């Protein structure tokens, strides 16, 4: 239909390391349908060397400047997008908001409610199994606790449409 504009939906995920963000992103990508955009995969493919959290933050910033306009265009054209990255800070969620608002698209913030004990156990299992598609590497207990200090659950004043996934 000429002149008709469809807009996709942006889905993104908030959860601690080991909560199951990538697993949920893949599930969503297969059921919505949607294009899954995996930050870790892109950073790896683009050749960024990640040896520290600081390296990851720098690479992530460059990745976002590259992928943001593309994701907005996909959404504007009616393609739904699942962001497989940690929407764990207010700043990271503001970035996604800018992407979907630029496309006048809908959104859902998927929040994974998992205990630290569950996340640590999942990280231990993932470190042992080394499944394909996991690019951040070995997540030690020290790394988990180091990145968890930056975790900020979504606040009501952020005004996101939230769907909570309880992992107990």
Where are these regions (language model features)?
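Hydrophobic anchor at the beta1->P-loop junction of P-loop NTPases
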Residues: 13
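Glycine-rich phosphate-binding loop used to anchor ATP phosphates in small-molecule kinases
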Residues: 59-103, 107
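Conserved substrate/cofactor phosphate-moiety recognition/catalytic segment
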Residues: 19-79
